[in-house]
C-alpha cells in the first residue's frame, strides 16, 4: 500500500519510489474528476503485468482531492491458460488472464457486483483473490482516516506542503548520493538466457553521470520477445528499470525517504518496442527476469564508475514453483506459489554474496514448514549448493 499526492508522485512506499503519472487524460483521473466517490479497480494499465490487481482510493479534504491511496496485490490466479496465470511460454497478453481497464469497484460506497462477478468468473480461486482485495480496501480506508486525522490536527494545507517537502527532501539526498559517482559515461551489457527455443536477449545500458544527475540510454537492447519476459514500462523512468540506482542511493544514505523524489535526478530513454519497453500485445507475466537483467547492467555501470565497485551480479531470476491442487482438508481448489528459489547475491568487494536471497527483491525462499502447511506436499530437503556459480 502506497500514498501518492494529487500529482501522482509517491510519498511513501516501503520497497521502491513507485510513481505513476496519472495526467488529465488518464481514465483514472477522469473517474475522480467526474465523480469523486468510488474506488477504481484495474488489472491492466497501472503496473507491469496482469496479475497485479490495482486499487486507487481518492482522499479528499474539504471537497478537494489532496492525495490518493494506492494498493496492489499480486493475485495468485486471474485466469489464463495455466494455474497462476504465468508461463514463460506465453507469446501474447491474451493468454495471461483477465484484462480489465480502470472501472469503479465501488460507487458511493456500494459494491459494483458486476465487476466482482467478472473477476470471480475469471479466476480459479475467486475466494482467495476477493479476500486479497478486501484486505487492500481495509488498508486504503485506514490511509484515508489517518491522512484526514493529520489534516484535522495540522491543517490540510500544512499536510499537503509536508507531502511535497518530503519528496523534495528525498530528491536532495538522492542528488548528494549520485554526486559520489565520478562524472563520466559508463557502458555495460549482458544477456538473458534460457528463453524459449534457446533464444537469448541482449540488454545494453549507457549511464551518463553529470552534476548529481544520471541519464540512462538503453538503446541497443533487443526487441520485445515472443515470450513472457517483456517489461511494459511506458517509456518512463520506471522503477523496475532503474531499481539498481535507487538501491545504490539507499545504500549510500539509508535515511533517504523512499518516495518519488529519488527518481527526479534520474532520466532514462528506453526505445519503444524493446524488451524493456514492450508494447501491446506483448506477454509480460515473467517480466521480473528482464527487470533483474536491467538491474545487472546498471550494476555493471556503477562498478565501472566506482574504484572498488559494489558487488557482482546475482544469480538472476528466481525459479518459481506453482502448485495447483485441491486443499486436502476442504477439497477446494488451491493455486499456490509455494516457493521462489533464489540463488543468492553476487560477491561484494570484501565478503561473499548473500546466500539464498534475491538481491533485487529482498526476498528469500519460503521455509519448508510453510510449504508443508499450505500444500499436501512433504519436502525431503532443500539445500544450497556451495559455489554453484563460482567461489564468492
Where on the chain are the PLM-derived regions?
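Glycine/proline-enriched, intrinsically flexible loops and inter-domain linkers
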Residues: 1-392
Amino acid at each position: 500500500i502506497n500514498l501518492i499526492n494529487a500529482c501522482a508522485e509517491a510519498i511513501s512506499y516501503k520497497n521502491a519510489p513507485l510513481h505513476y503519472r496519472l495526467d488529465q487524460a488518464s481514465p483514472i483521473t477522469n473517474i475522480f474528476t467526474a465523480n469523486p466517490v468510488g474506488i477504481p479497480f484495474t488489472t491492466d494499465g497501472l503496473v507491469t503485468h496482469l496479475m497485479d490487481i490495482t486499487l486507487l482510493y481518492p482522499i479528499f479534504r474539504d471537497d478537494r482531492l489532496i492525495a490518493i491511496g494506492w494498493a496492489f496485490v499480486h493475485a495468485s490466479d486471474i485466469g489464463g491458460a495455466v494455474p497462476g496465470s504465468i508461463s514463460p511460454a506465453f507469446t501474447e497478453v491474451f493468454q495471461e488472464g483477465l484484462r480489465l481497464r480502470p472501472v469503479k469497484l465501488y460507487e458511493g460506497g456500494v459494491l459494483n457486483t458486476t465487476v466482482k462477478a467478472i473477476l470471480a468468473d475469471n479466476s480459479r480461486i475467486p475466494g482467495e483473490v476477493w479476500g486479497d482485495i478486501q484486505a487492500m480496501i481495509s488498508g486504503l480506508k485506514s490511509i484515508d482516516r489517518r491522512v484526514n486525522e493529520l489534516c484535522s490536527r495540522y491543517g490540510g494545507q500544512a499536510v499537503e506542503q509536508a507531502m511535497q517537502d518530503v519528496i523534495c527532501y528525498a530528491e536532495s539526498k538522492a542528488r548528494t548520493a549520485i554526486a559520489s559517482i565520478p562524472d563520466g559515461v559508463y557502458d555495460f551489457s549482458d544477456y538473458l538466457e534460457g528463453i524459449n527455443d534457446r533464444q537469448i536477449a541482449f540488454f545494453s545500458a549507457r549511464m551518463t553521470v553529470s552534476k548529481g544527475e544520471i541519464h540512462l540510454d538503453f538503446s541497443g537492447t533487443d526487441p520485445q520477445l515472443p515470450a513472457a519476459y517483456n517489461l511494459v514500462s511506458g517509456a518512463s523512468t520506471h522503477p523496475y528499470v532503474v531499481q539498481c540506482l535507487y538501491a545504490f542511493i539507499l545504500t549510500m544514505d539509508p535515511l533517504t525517504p523512499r518516495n518519488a523524489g529519488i527518481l527526479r535526478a534520474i532520466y532514462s530513454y528506453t526505445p519503444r518496442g524493446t524488451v524493456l519497453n514492450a508494447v501491446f500485445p506483448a506477454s509480460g507475466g515473467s517480466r521480473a527476469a528482464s527487470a533483474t537483467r536491467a538491474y545487472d547492467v546498471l550494476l555493471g555501470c556503477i562498478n565501472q564508475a566506482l574504484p572498488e565497485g559494489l558487488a557482482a551480479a546475482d544469480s538472476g531470476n528466481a525459479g518459481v514453483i506453482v502448485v495447483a491442487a485441491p486443499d486436502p482438508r476442504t477439497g477446494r481448489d488451491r493455486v499456490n506459489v509455494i516457493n521462489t528459489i533464489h540463488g543468492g547475491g553476487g560477491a561484494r568487494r570484501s565478503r561473499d554474496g548473500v546466500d539464498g536471497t534475491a538481491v533485487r527483491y529482498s526476498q528469500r525462499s519460503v521455509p519448508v514448514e510453510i510449504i508443508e502447511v499450505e500444500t499436501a506436499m512433504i519436502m525431503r530437503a532443500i539445500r544450497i549448493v556451495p559455489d554453484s556459480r563460482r567461489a564468492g
